[in-house]
Curated annotation (Swiss-Prot):
Function according to Swiss-Prot or TrEMBL: Involved in the gluconeogenesis. Catalyzes stereospecifically the conversion of dihydroxyacetone phosphate (DHAP) to D-glyceraldehyde-3-phosphate (G3P).
Species name: Geotalea uraniireducens (strain Rf4) (Geobacter uraniireducens)
PROSITE patterns assigned to the protein according to its UniProt record, in alphabetical order: TIM_1 (PS00171), TIM_2 (PS51440)
Gene field: tpiA
Enzyme Commission designation: 5.3.1.1
Name by which UniProt lists this protein: Triosephosphate isomerase
Pfam families cross-referenced by the UniProt entry: TIM (PF00121)
GO biological process: one example: glycolytic process
The protein's annotated pathway: Carbohydrate biosynthesis; gluconeogenesis; Carbohydrate degradation; glycolysis; D-glyceraldehyde 3-phosphate from glycerone phosphate: step 1/1
GO MF annotation, one: triose-phosphate isomerase activity
Amino acid sequence: MRKPVIAGNWKLYKTTSEALELVNELIPLVKNASGVEIVVAPVFTVLSTVKNALKGTNINLAAQDCFWDEQGAYTGEVSSTMLLDAGCSHVIIGHSERRQFFGETDETVNKKNIAALRAGLTILFCIGETLHEREENQTFTVLERQISGGISGITKDELKNVIIAYEPVWAIGTGKTATDDQAQEAHKFIRGVVAKLCDSESAENIRILYGGSVKPENVKGLMAQKDIDGALVGGASLKADSFAHIVRFSE
């Protein structure tokens, strides 16, 4: 049985005081939530502060990106081992905004995936097609390329610490959401690609999250789908009550 994951990507929001206010509101709202893995991903500058606030709670800490080398002359970068040192257990890699604005490629995403896994982090590995690619019927081609490139060189054992997040780029921050059927179709395909590249056991066990305008109003329908194992939440994770509602989708 795959344990659902609800992860909040705070993106470039929340100063230290705002982040503390948010987690302090969130903690009591989700403390009794069972059967779900909860993750929040603040900006780098507040990771240690948020980690201290989360001590003894059921909420895991993630970073929004990492670099592929452990150390070196890479101005502005943060390594996986540094994230671990800051108290992170998870890291988001390959988000479409990183691909779009910062030139992430399947190759650089793969290097980051491997570095994070070997440092001991669980990765939230993001994939997804643009509106143009969907309209050109390229969705499955793009997803297979991204998965194949992203998990190249990753062992079956390491794959246990990989969570895939499917985020159709056209649904991120637009208010548009894939229908339940569209999301399930993509998730089923993704699981099939993992089976083809690895094996059926790995495919059955890997958790695949949906991301793209997930809200309290649509989470139940998405989570009712056979191959959807959770959500990577953007805007709705910036308010404690809406994120808690998503975390408690099964209640």
